[in-house]
Amino acid sequence: MNRGFGLAIGAGCVLVIAVIAVLVFTFLWIPFRVVRETAVEAPATNRPVIQTVGTALPPAPTFTPAPPSASTANTASTGTNGANGPALVTTSNLLAGRYEQLSPGVVNINVLVESAEGSGQGAGSGFILDREGHIVTNNHVVAGATDIVVNFANGLQAEAEVLGVDDDSDLAVIKVEQMPESAHPLPLGDSDLIQVGDWAIAIGNPFGLGGSMTLGIISALGRTIPSGVAQFSIPQAIQTDAAINPGNSGGPLLNLDGEVIGVNAQIRTGGANANTGVGFAIPVNVVRHVVPSLIANGSFQWPYLGIGGTDLNLLIAKANNLDIQQGAYITSVEADGPAGAAGLRGAPSLSQPTVGGDVATQVDGQPIATFDDLLNYIAFKNPGDQITLTVLRNGQPQQIAVTLGSRPDLDVQSP
């Protein structure tokens, strides 16, 4: 064979092999490179969006929702979102049905306030309690109002009068003489049955935008919050991340069964005049406790113990030679109050308030872990009721019976 010809054939073979190698490399490498860039280079900020689109909300608790309208039902039956679509559509349909069912029971409230400085306007929310025209709202919504106008979901309006208010719970009842036929009461639930993580719905009038609905969860339970207009606190408040803004005050916080579980009252803003994900509602069991008296008498009498205190903690326990860390440590006792009359003791020295006070560990046989536990238990009693406190005094257990009084009008906060 000619040497030149052989070299040419060899070079040609090398060229062919090189071309084949390039083609194989191209077809194998390019798809791998694209997949790798998609997985590695995609910005992290995109991931929540992808999860929101592709992940269904957790299923709602089992119950039979109110039948939605035909248009809502048609939307649910035709919606498609892949494998997770039915769950998303079902949840969306449930919420749409709940709004249609519940919104006629929610009202917007506009008030006119006259003062020495002039007149002003305010707005809030409320919900219908019964067919007699009683509406529950916040005291701070209607306090000082000279005129109150209730706006119903169908657009009709009616004037209202204040029947009763309670500063300490920030609750009020107003009444209209006539309601539209479409308006209806909202059922009351049981705030003792709700749990952290339960879904929560708020419907109201934020920033004057009536008929607004927001969704969140129960973030915490058993909060004690200031009433905002009185020196006493509201017990067992519900914390939620459902958006609550100015104008939502007095509106209902509801569960997915369509029951009122609270009355929206406050937000923790951190200085901003808007929702920051921390809202508070007065529990519906406080509503059950207070509102009947507001309707019948125009006011409510809260029980009163007459003590000051704090949670027992490690440092207080150590200072008092106690081997427990839970209880209500009593720092002060009002001498002529119910606790003083019964013989409860606070710290004997103002210079050492964490030494020598009684430590309440039980009330009527129920354990007390914090000072709020004691206050919350008393809050659902009535003046004249008798309670039995188990206390540690100098490390020794004692049982002390106390007859509760009525809250006085104080200048400073006292439990």
Where are these regions (language model features)?
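N-terminal Sec-pathway targeting helices
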Residues: 1-16
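Conserved PDZ fold ligand-binding element
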Residues: 135-136, 341-372
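Hydrophobic alpha-helical elements and their junctions with loops/disorder across both membrane
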Residues: 17-19, 144, 324, 346
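Hydrophobic alpha-helical transmembrane signal-anchor segments
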Residues: 14-25
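Serine-dependent protease modules
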Residues: 26-326, 331-335, 363, 371-375, ...
